[in-house]
């Protein structure tokens, strides 16, 4: 999973924590070819930025994090890394910059009003620029099994991370998140995840078969087999939005 630290009302130690993962490659695959300038909102220690730089060496990457310690690490891949609470006003110097793409990788579920925050950052995207989003799917098969067993407990990580303030599904994510952003038009929605093959996957099926079954399951039943929902929206001028 791609859990993030909270951006609001966190303890002082949250400002010094360091969050690392391997980046969210399936989400970054939604970037248009050769983006010139990208903003990663909730960039952590720069794992997404590292993947972007490996693929697009000339891309100028900016990031936002709540942790000064993370920012120091992330700067090795970034032109600038901003440290502030995204539920407050965007600093004037940053608000004047336009980005080909803005990334929200497992960040919006931590916010009180993620749709409003998304709309605020949408103004940093020019016409035909994009916003790409990843949020966890609360109704994946694994979560449904937990609910069926009567389990609904917050945890330090995962879908029921105790810092998650909003829950999304494949069906509801785009409808809720884009509701306050008339400038953004949905162009794609998909999931990544897996079908519960258990011992078949481990001992019997070739990896290519397992990947095929996972892909088929995610395409046909995304709300059941998807672990994360991936959304891409493109900015249009307001006078063209119906």
Where are these regions (language model features)?
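Small/polar loops that bind or transfer phosphate-bearing groups
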Residues: 40, 109, 133
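Short beta->alpha junction loops/turns
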Residues: 67, 107-110, 138
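S-adenosyl-L-methionine-dependent methyltransferase catalytic module, highlighting the catalytic core
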Residues: 11-17, 22, 47, 86, ...
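A short beta-strand submotif of the Rossmann-like class I SAM-dependent methyltransferase core
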Residues: 101-107
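Active-site flanking residues adjacent to catalytic metal/cofactor-binding acidic residues
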Residues: 39, 105, 136
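Conserved N-terminal segment of class I S-adenosyl-L-methionine
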Residues: 1-97, 101, 115-118, 189-194, ...
């Amino acid at each position: 999973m791609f859990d993030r630290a909270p951006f609001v009302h966190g303890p002082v130690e949250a400002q010094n924590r360091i969050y690392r993962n391997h980046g969210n490659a399936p989400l970054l695959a939604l970037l248009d070819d050769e983006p010139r300038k990208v903003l990663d909102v909730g960039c952590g220690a720069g794992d997404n930025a590292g993947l972007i730089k490996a693929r697009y060496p000339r891309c100028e990457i900016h990031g936002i994090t709540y942790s000064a310690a993370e920012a120091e690490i992330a700067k090795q891949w970034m032109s600038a890394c901003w440290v502030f609470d995204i539920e407050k006003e965007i600093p004037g110097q940053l608000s004047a910059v336009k980005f080909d793409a803005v990334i929200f990788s497992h960040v919006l579920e931590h916010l009180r009003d993620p749709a409003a925050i998304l709309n605020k950052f949408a103004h940093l995207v020019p016409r035909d620029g994009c916003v790409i989003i990843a949020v966890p799917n609360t109704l994946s098969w694994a979560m449904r099994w937990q609910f069926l067993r009567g389990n609904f407990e917050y945890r330090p990580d995962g879908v029921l991370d105790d810092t998650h303030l909003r829950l999304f599904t494949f069906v509801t994510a785009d409808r809720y998140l884009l509701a306050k952003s008339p400038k953004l038009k949905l162009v794609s929605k998909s999931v990544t995840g897996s079908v519960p093959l258990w011992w078949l996957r481990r001992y019997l099926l070739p990896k290519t078969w397992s990947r095929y079954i996972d892909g088929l399951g995610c395409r046909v039943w995304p709300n059941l087999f998807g672990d994360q929902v991936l959304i891409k929206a493109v900015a249009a001028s307001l006078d063209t939005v119906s």
